[in-house]
């Protein structure tokens, strides 16, 4: 029963990891697209700069920065998953050694 629980845990960890990688990839693409749009818009407005436009762009870039903060959290989650898998590998190696 414990082995089956461990197997389900590994499966869930794998699913969680894949989903996290997908979310990171999706978020990176989204942020890249938004940053590209902002830079293109900024270039278009170089000749027509106004304080209002600058403030709007600053707020949008702050949004991009918030998105990057989210990405940092995702990478921290990935690091935690790595630590969990390392710990599991050590326990598995220990269990295998005990069985020999």
Swiss-Prot record:
The keyword Iron-sulfur does not apply. It is found in: Cytoplasm. GO terms for cellular component: BLOC-1 complex; endosome. It comes from Candida glabrata (strain ATCC 2001 / BCRC 20586 / JCM 3761 / NBRC 0622 / NRRL Y-65 / CBS 138) (Yeast). Component of the biogenesis of lysosome-related organelles complex-1 (BLOC-1). Residues 25-46 form a coiled coil. Its main location: cytoplasm. Keywords: Coiled coil, Cytoplasm, Transport. This is Biogenesis of lysosome-related organelles complex 1 subunit CNL1. Transmembrane segments: none annotated. Signal peptide: none annotated. Belongs to the BLOC1S4 family. Component of the biogenesis of lysosome-related organelles complex-1 (BLOC-1), a complex that is involved in endosomal cargo sorting. GO terms for biological process: endosome organization; regulation of protein localization.
């Amino acid at each position: 029963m414990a082995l089956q629980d461990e197997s389900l845990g590994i499966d869930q960890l794998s699913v969680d990891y894949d989903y996290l990688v997908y979310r990171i990839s999706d978020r990176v693409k989204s942020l890249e697209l938004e940053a590209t749009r902002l830079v293109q818009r900024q270039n278009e407005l170089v000749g027509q700069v106004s304080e209002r436009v600058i403030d709007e762009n600053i707020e949008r870039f702050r949004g991009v920065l918030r998105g990057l903060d989210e990405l940092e959290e995702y990478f921290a989650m990935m690091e935690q998953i790595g630590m969990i898998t390392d710990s599991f590998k050590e326990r598995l190696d220990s269990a295998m050694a005990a069985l020999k």
